[in-house]
Structures are given as C-alpha cells and as structure tokens.
Amino acid sequence: MAPLRLSRANPLAFARWPVTLITAVVYLAFLIPLLIVHHVVPSPPTANPNGLDLTQAWADLQVLTDGFHPYNSRRNDEVHTWLLQRIHEILDAAPPADQYLSVDEEKPKPAVFVFDDTQSNLSFVGNSLSSSNTAVYFEGTNILVYIRGSDDDHENWWEEPNGVPSGKGGVLVNAHYDSVSTGYGATDDGVGVVTCLQLIQYFMTPGHAPRRGLVVLLNNGEEDYLNGARVYGQHPISKFPHTFLNLEGAGAGGRAILFRSSDTEVTRPYMSSKYPFGSVLAADGFATGLIGSQTDYVVFEVDLGLRGLDVAFMEPRARYHTEQDDSRHTSKSSLWHMLSAAVATTEGLVSDKSDQFEGAPTDDAKVASGSGSKAVWFDLFGTTFVLFELHTLFALSVTLLVVAPLALLVTGIALTRADKMYLFRTSAKADESLDSVPLQGLRGFFRFPFLFAIPTAVTVGLAYLVTKVNPLIIHSSEYAVWSMMLSAWTFLAWFVSRMADFARPTALHRIYTLTWMFVLAWVLLVISTVYQNQRGLAGSYSVFFFFSGTFLATWISYLELFSLPRKSEYANQNRPTSRRASSYGGSRLGTASGEDHEEDDHDAEEEEEEQEPTESTSLLGGGQRTTFANYVRVAGDHRDSDTDHHYYPGVYKHEQRWSASLPTWTWTLQFLLMAPLVLIMVGPLALLLTSALHQTGQDGSSSLFIYVAIAALTTFLLTPLLPFIHRHTYHLPVFLLLVFLGTLIYNLVAFPFSPTNRLKLFFIQDIDLSTGSTTASLAGVQPYVHAAASTLPSTANQNITCTEHTTRGTKCAWPGLAPRVVPDTPYSDWLDFTISQQHNTTDDKEGDEDTHHPRKARITLSGRNTRACKLLFDSPISSFAVLGSSTDPRFPTSSPHGTKEIRLWSREWENEWVVDVAWTTSTNDDSEEGDEGEGKLNGKAVCLWSDNNSAGVIPALDEVRQFAPSWVAVSKAADGLVEGWKGFSI
C-alpha cells in the first residue's frame, strides 16, 4: 500500500490521532474533576465566619462522642445534661439588645425559649416501621429551642390549653443526639447536633436574627425506629414549623449530600449553599424502596405534614454504626460542609416573606403547610446547584420527543429534494444512461447493534461472573470493578468497530451510529417521561440531556450531507467508461465487490496523466490545496506499489469516493455535544450510586444489583464514543485490554476486606433468665461470619451453629461468656413481670353466629439497670394499650395484621410498664382442647441492655472486638446488645 500523508496536519480532522487524543482528553478532563469533587471535601475557612465558631464546634463534637450514648445508656443522660448546659452558655453569651438594633432596626434581639421535654410520650404501630406488626411505646427526652422571629406571634400561645400559633409558620432544624450502642455517633449524628448548636449561636448574632421563628430540635431515640421525631409531634411547639431541615449521617465523613426534598419551593434556599452536593436520584431511591433505611425526614414530611430537606453524610458505610464513627475518622472539613449548607438553607427559610409555605393541610391533623411542585435538582462540580420544576422537565421532554424526529424528517426530505440523500441508496444513475454508479449508501447501517450489544452483554456477563465468584470485592475495591467494566467495554467496542471498518469501510459509520443512538435515546426518553408523569420520578433527567446532545449531533450529520454533490452530478462525473475491476471502495474480504466493482474507472493513462502546473498547484505534486473542512491526501506512486490499492484525495482510505466532499472537523462538535453532557449528568450519578451501595452487601442486600448497575452506567458513559471509536489508534485500546485482564484477575481472586474497609458483623447476646443459658451470635455474610466466630477463644472446641438469618444472611451462634449488665444480681431478678387475665364482661348472645370473642390480659413488666423492654407474642394480638400513654390520630395504634411485638421505652431507669393486651380466640378454643394450649397466648417478656461503655460488662462483645480479624467491624444486631427473656403463657 502506498503511504498516506496529510499535506498539512489538521488537528481536528476525523483521523486516528486527532480522534484518539481529543476523545481521551475530553473524558479525562471531565472525569478527573468529578472524582476530585466527589472525594475531596472543601477546607473550612481560616477565620470564623460571622456568628460561627468552628473551633468550638469541633470541641463540642469531641465531647459529644467520647462514649457510646444510645437511648438505653447512662451516657445518654449525661449528653442530655451537657447539651442543655451548652445551649444556655450560648444564649448567655448573646450580645445585649442595643447591638441588634444598631445592625437592623427591624430585627430586635429575639426572645428564646428552651424546652426540656420530659413529658411527651406516644404509642404507635405500623406505617413507617420495618414491620407493620411491631408496636412501640416511647417516652421522649427531646430538647427544643425556639428563637422567636420578628414576624412571629409575640404571645406564648403554647402555654394555653389547645393553643395554636397565628401568622406564618416557622422553620424546624432537627438532629438526633443518641447514637447506636456500637458507635460513637460522630457523623450519626454528632455533626448534625453541633451544627444545631452553631445555628443557635448564628441566629443569636446581631444581623442574623430570623424573620420567621426557628425551632431547633435535638431529639433522642432516632436510632430505635425514629421514636424521638414522633414524640416531638406531641409537644405544643410542633404546631408552629411549616418547613424543616433534617441533619443526618450514614457514614464517617466526606460531603454532606442533599438526600431528598419535598418540593421545588422548599429546596430553593439550598441553592445559596457554597458547596451544594446531591442529586434528585437519591430521592427516587427512597421513593422506589431502593434505599431501605429511613431518617426523621419521613416522620416530619409524611406523618406531620411539613415540607423540608434531608441533608446527610453517606459514606463509607463500613464505618457506619461502628466504633470508627468517631471524630478521628471524620474531619473539620466535613463538619464545615454540613454547617455551611445548614446555615445557607436555614437562613433562606427563616428570611422568606412569601405565603408559599401556607395552605390547606393534606390531612386535618397535619400542619397547614400547603403544597409545592415536584423538583428536579443536581449539583455541577460541587459549586453550582441546578433546580427546576419536574413539570418543566416533562414539558421539555414531550416537546423534544416531537420536535427532534420532525427536524430530522424535514432535513431528510430536504436532502431528498436536493438529490443529496445518500443514506440507504445503493446506486445512482447518470443522466441519459442506463448505467448506474454504486454509492454504497447502505453500508454501515447494521453495525451499531453489534457495537452496542457485544460490549454491553460482556459487561453484564462480568457482573454475573464477579457476583458468582467474589461478590463482595466491590466492598473495598469499587474502582477496580469500574476499571474492569470500562476497559472491557471500550476495548470490545473498538475491536468490533475496527473489524467492521476493515471488512466494509464506510464514511457513513458516524451518521448511522448516531441515528441508532437517536432512536435508542428517544425510546429511553419516552420511558423516562412516562415515569415523570405517572410516578413523579425525576432522577432520569440525565436521559433528557443525553437525548438533547444525541439529537443535535445526529442533526449535524444529516446537515453535513448538504455538502455532498447531487447524486446525479456524482454519477455523471463517475460514469463508467471502461470495465475493469477495482478494489477501491469495496469489501476488503474476499473478491472485490465495491464501488468500482460495477463501474468502469478512468483509464490508466487518464489516472497517470498529470495536470499542467499552475499557480495553485501543490508543491508536493498531484495534491490539492488544503482546506479546514477536507482531507488532502498525497498518494504515492502506484506504479511502484506492490498493491493495486489507491486512495483518492479527500477520501479516508477505502471509504466511498463521494465522501471527499464531507467536512472533516464537524465530528469534534458532535462529540462535544454528547460526551460532556453525559459525563456531567451521568458521572456524578455513577459515583453517587457506587458510594451509596458498594458496601451494602454486608447488610444482606443483593450484590448483583450494584454490579449490573455499574455495567449499565458504563454503557451510558461510553456510548458517546461509538460514532468515533473506529478511528482510534490501537494504543489506548490495547492498554485497556491489559487493564481489563489485570483487574479481572484481581476482582476474582482478591480478598474483599481490609482494615480500612472492614466487613460489618452484627452482634447480639441472648440469655434465658430462667435457666441462665446464654448464647452469643454474629450475623453476616458467609463464609466470613463463621471464619470470624472461629477465631474467638470461647468458640474453641465449641460447636458453632450457623443458621439462615431473615435479613443479615447467616447467623452463627455459640455459648457466650456470661454478661454482667446487672452486677451481683441473680439472672432471675434481672426481669420481673406479672400477668393478670381480665375476663370479658359482655355476655355472648345466644345464637350468635360469630365464632370469635376477645380475651384480655394486663402485663406488668420491669427490668433491672435498663429502661427498655419488649413483649413478644407467638401469635398476633389485636390491640394494646400502655398505662399513661398518649395517642395521636397521625400515628395508628393498631394494625390490620395484628401485633406480635411491643417495644417499651422509658425515660426513667428500672421503670414499670403496665400493658393491656387483647386478642381474639375461637369459641372452640374454650373446649377441653383449649386446655392443651390452643386458646392460650404464648410469648416472651424481654429486657434490653445497650450500655457498652465499660470493659467487662459484655465480655462476649469485648472478646469479639479483641480477637476477631482486623478486617471485621462489629455493629449492633438489634436495639439491645444483650437481651434477657422469660417465657409466658396466658
């Protein structure tokens, strides 16, 4: 083959090196900043902003997290006392009233009211619990701080019986100060708590006094089924706020993400955040059940009727609810990120003058906060926040679904009328001739399905392979998985396209590939639009931008065809004059069958005939003047070549001769219309999904989903390369092949855990208080949970029993070391309960066809050194009531499926609960067979111990922490670390 040279290198030409370099640079230019934004948290300012004290906030966090402080611990009471002390210190340090007026005459020093709520309690069952047959009685110890706004009612309306506020609603900011029994609670939710303390200080600073009143809620009991938020609804001040900001944590650092929001209007203040971070896709994850856990947000929005936002830390999940959720493993940068977002959002909400948060409630018992429009929101590189209404996206989607195909159709008609529609045309006839000139306009049309399907199928196959062989490798090596998927997809797409291009070269590869992509994107946008309209899911906004870029790129390809000669003109210029076969333009496999196979080329003498030199003749001889839009190739001397292949000026290798008229720089514009949009919109979603889910396999979630999701996102991210990848050189794809082979081997054989990415196992110890028999257990993923249990000294020469766990995979149990949660007390005295059966006074009517009648009993229960117990029933009870409990129509107290568990929480230690239960039995159960147990109610009385702040109190847990492998972390399996029980039968 004669060497191919460009007379002058065009840096934007549709040739191998420009395409390779430009596409690689663009992808790196966007992916690297996205990774930096995702993993690097902005540093806090060197000087404290007005009204804030970051040094004090960090010191407060260290005090708060110096011990485990679950609701059922003595340390929890100490934290409660310390918080009240800190609040009063902040309020006492507030400047005198005259300083406020000197800054803003309309905003005098606000009045502040601190409520230590030790009165509210509530019984409820069902709707937001993980199981609808679980009931709860809870006594709250919430702390509320109300900073009166300048526009608020100046009367203490909450002191009146059934008092209600007047005027506009206020703003609630919430964080919970309890931790889990196995975690120090630095991010869950210590950062949220110290942020609330800083907000109190900020809005007590002159110049920041609120217009709308601010209620800061530090609730206790979130970790045990959001109890504190529900009990907040029983306090009179809960009638006042209409909007809220919930601060939460599910990791140990990083950026605080906007998880979800109620509507566009309440989200708008978040736009003022200096470092916005998040996507509405996370909200869709909650709405569809993909994210199973919940925060206090659901209570405020669903149960109480407020409108608000949920801001939380989300990674790493391996440290969530473990002893590494401490101040050592978070940072001041993370604290500043949440604090800055909270200040900006809260200031926007309390400064609002409109009535957009007033209106009829969705339920008579809920707050009259009105309603807003569903929102679409996402950040751009952690610096800009994009927010618009969902119906705007819906309208744009519908418009584009109609306009885009019409635009291509009109363009196609115009091309046909101009006689320049080369697509799908195999030949063209010359004027006044029966002979036709081949156009090869169908070549490349069927290429895209293979280019798209083969790499996608292989990556999905890899997802299944890794799930089968080493499903938890993504726990510690998520980027090894991403590298495997990306490299495999890219190499296969390049290989398939190069093989197709070698066999049947065509200048129509780009336009046909874009046309297929347009159709695929159109179908995806139809599906996305349907979900937007029917289910209110906004997370598919990326599909709209993908379709927009694909449409414009496709349209440009169609417009390019106007630069071609008319087909009849081309046929006249290339009318056959001889009958010799040529390999030019044909298939490069087998016999020549291309453009010149059926046409007579110029005679050899005409081809070799030289033009007379002119002023514009190229100095390189036989060439043409270069233009920005076209290639200029200088062919070698074919007479000296060992092959009959020859290239025509402006034609890329063996592609159709008419393609010489196509511009060669427009591919750059097409690529820039697609790739950056996809990377900006889909890249953060891919990182968000990976961070949220790559360590959830340890919790019992399916590992396959995250692998398949990565495979799908890989396809989404790399699809913009398909129209251009056949022009890539071999260097990068071959390198990616090596990357693929290395990461594939690693992902299949590497151990999935490490000391920095530990496997979370869930501990609990059960003790039969009647016999003293105790069993310790770890729940988690096999075979790792058994391997961890086998390393413990107490399991040596012991039988470890492993059974299937309902939610955690496998539970391995062994005779554990005796707990000392109630020292110097016999096991039988750890829990006391009595049962008195209450007979139904209503006489059954003769001839009553109802074969069921209720039975009732009163159970009195108390535990030593605890304030948490529960009642478990083998069969559901129909109703329950706790003596002294409040009820609320917003929180049901019965379930249509009955109740099999009643959880009891008291603010007092060693409290005695009196519980009335009722259940129905068949009249047949009163027969003699009933004496054998058919009519009886069987169950257990259980008390919980969760205080793990002293070594030796729970030796079995201490043993796991000391002797388990370094790649193991311990978390709680239930509300109690130790659960002691006694059986009963009524």
UniProtKB/Swiss-Prot annotation:
<dbReference type="GO" id="GO:0005774">
    <property type="term" value="C:vacuolar membrane"/>
</dbReference>
<feature type="glycosylation site" description="N-linked (GlcNAc...) asparagine">
    <location>
        <position position="799"/>
    </location>
</feature>
<feature type="topological domain" description="Vacuolar">
    <location>
        <begin position="38"/>
        <end position="392"/>
    </location>
</feature>
<feature type="binding site">
    <location>
        <position position="248"/>
    </location>
    <ligand>
        <name>Zn(2+) 1</name>
    </ligand>
</feature>
<feature type="topological domain" description="Cytoplasmic">
    <location>
        <begin position="726"/>
        <end position="732"/>
    </location>
</feature>
<keyword id="KW-0479">Metal-binding</keyword>
<feature type="region of interest" description="Disordered">
    <location>
        <begin position="573"/>
        <end position="622"/>
    </location>
</feature>
<feature type="topological domain" description="Vacuolar">
    <location>
        <begin position="690"/>
        <end position="704"/>
    </location>
</feature>
<keyword id="KW-0862">Zinc</keyword>
<dbReference type="Pfam" id="PF22250">
    <property type="entry name" value="PFF1_C"/>
</dbReference>
<feature type="glycosylation site" description="N-linked (GlcNAc...) asparagine">
    <location>
        <position position="948"/>
    </location>
</feature>
<feature type="transmembrane region" description="Helical; Name=2">
    <location>
        <begin position="393"/>
        <end position="413"/>
    </location>
</feature>
<feature type="transmembrane region" description="Helical; Name=3">
    <location>
        <begin position="445"/>
        <end position="465"/>
    </location>
</feature>
<feature type="compositionally biased region" description="Polar residues">
    <location>
        <begin position="573"/>
        <end position="585"/>
    </location>
</feature>
<feature type="topological domain" description="Vacuolar">
    <location>
        <begin position="532"/>
        <end position="535"/>
    </location>
</feature>
<feature type="binding site">
    <location>
        <position position="176"/>
    </location>
    <ligand>
        <name>Zn(2+) 1</name>
    </ligand>
</feature>
<dbReference type="InterPro" id="IPR048024">
    <property type="entry name" value="Fxna-like_M28_dom"/>
</dbReference>
<keyword id="KW-0926">Vacuole</keyword>
<dbReference type="InterPro" id="IPR053975">
    <property type="entry name" value="PFF1_C"/>
</dbReference>
<feature type="topological domain" description="Vacuolar">
    <location>
        <begin position="754"/>
        <end position="986"/>
    </location>
</feature>
<dbReference type="InterPro" id="IPR045175">
    <property type="entry name" value="M28_fam"/>
</dbReference>
<feature type="binding site">
    <location>
        <position position="321"/>
    </location>
    <ligand>
        <name>Zn(2+) 2</name>
    </ligand>
</feature>
<feature type="topological domain" description="Cytoplasmic">
    <location>
        <begin position="497"/>
        <end position="510"/>
    </location>
</feature>
<keyword id="KW-0378">Hydrolase</keyword>
<feature type="transmembrane region" description="Helical; Name=5">
    <location>
        <begin position="511"/>
        <end position="531"/>
    </location>
</feature>
<comment type="similarity">
    <text>Belongs to the peptidase M28 family.</text>
</comment>
<feature type="transmembrane region" description="Helical; Name=6">
    <location>
        <begin position="536"/>
        <end position="556"/>
    </location>
</feature>
<feature type="transmembrane region" description="Helical; Name=9">
    <location>
        <begin position="733"/>
        <end position="753"/>
    </location>
</feature>
<dbReference type="GO" id="GO:0046872">
    <property type="term" value="F:metal ion binding"/>
</dbReference>
<keyword id="KW-1133">Transmembrane helix</keyword>
<feature type="transmembrane region" description="Helical; Name=8">
    <location>
        <begin position="705"/>
        <end position="725"/>
    </location>
</feature>
<feature type="transmembrane region" description="Helical; Name=1">
    <location>
        <begin position="17"/>
        <end position="37"/>
    </location>
</feature>
<feature type="compositionally biased region" description="Acidic residues">
    <location>
        <begin position="596"/>
        <end position="613"/>
    </location>
</feature>
<keyword id="KW-0482">Metalloprotease</keyword>
<feature type="topological domain" description="Vacuolar">
    <location>
        <begin position="466"/>
        <end position="475"/>
    </location>
</feature>
<dbReference type="GO" id="GO:0008235">
    <property type="term" value="F:metalloexopeptidase activity"/>
</dbReference>
<feature type="binding site">
    <location>
        <position position="188"/>
    </location>
    <ligand>
        <name>Zn(2+) 1</name>
    </ligand>
</feature>
<feature type="region of interest" description="Disordered">
    <location>
        <begin position="840"/>
        <end position="859"/>
    </location>
</feature>
<protein>
    <recommendedName>
        <fullName>Vacuolar membrane protease</fullName>
        <ecNumber>3.4.-.-</ecNumber>
    </recommendedName>
</protein>
<keyword id="KW-0645">Protease</keyword>
<feature type="site" description="Transition state stabilizer">
    <location>
        <position position="320"/>
    </location>
</feature>
<dbReference type="InterPro" id="IPR053976">
    <property type="entry name" value="PFF1_TM"/>
</dbReference>
